[in-house]
Amino acid sequence: KEFECDGKLQWPELIGVPTKLAKEIIEKQNSLISNVHILLNGSPVTMDFRCNRVRLFDDILGSVVQIPRVA
């Protein structure tokens, strides 16, 4: 495995959840996450990997549409 990160690393149960609530849940469940970015689905992102970052991709209604994961 190329990257080793501690704590919970993905949240499939947050699909369909409002992104602001999902952000709070992620930060509560993994205190090592200090960067939660909310992005419209399809937005371009950098390819660098960080153990402290999760990207939340949402739709125009503000609900999570992709599994949030450390990236």
UniProtKB/Swiss-Prot annotation:
> Any idea what this protein is called?
Chymotrypsin inhibitor I, A, B and C subunits
- Key words of the record: Protease inhibitor, Serine protease inhibitor
Q: Which PANTHER family match?
A: PROTEIN, PUTATIVE, EXPRESSED-RELATED, WOUND-INDUCED PROTEINASE INHIBITOR 1
Q: Which InterPro entries match?
A: Prot_inh_pot1, Prot_inh_pot1_sf
Which Pfam families does the entry mention? potato_inhibit
Q: Which domain of life is it from?
A: Eukaryota
Consequence recorded when altering residue 24 to G: In components B and C
- Organism, scientific name: Solanum tuberosum
Looking up PROSITE patterns in the UniProt record yields:
POTATO_INHIBITOR (PS00285)
Give site residues, Reactive bond. 47-48
Q: What's the family?
A: Belongs to the protease inhibitor I13 (potato type I serine protease inhibitor) family.
Q: Which is one GO molecular function term here?
A: serine-type endopeptidase inhibitor activity
**Repeat as a keyword?**
no
Biological process (GO) annotations held by this record are:
response to wounding
Tell me the impact of changing residue 49 to Y: In components B and C
> What is the recorded function of this protein according to its Swiss-Prot or TrEMBL entry?
Inhibits both chymotrypsin and trypsin.
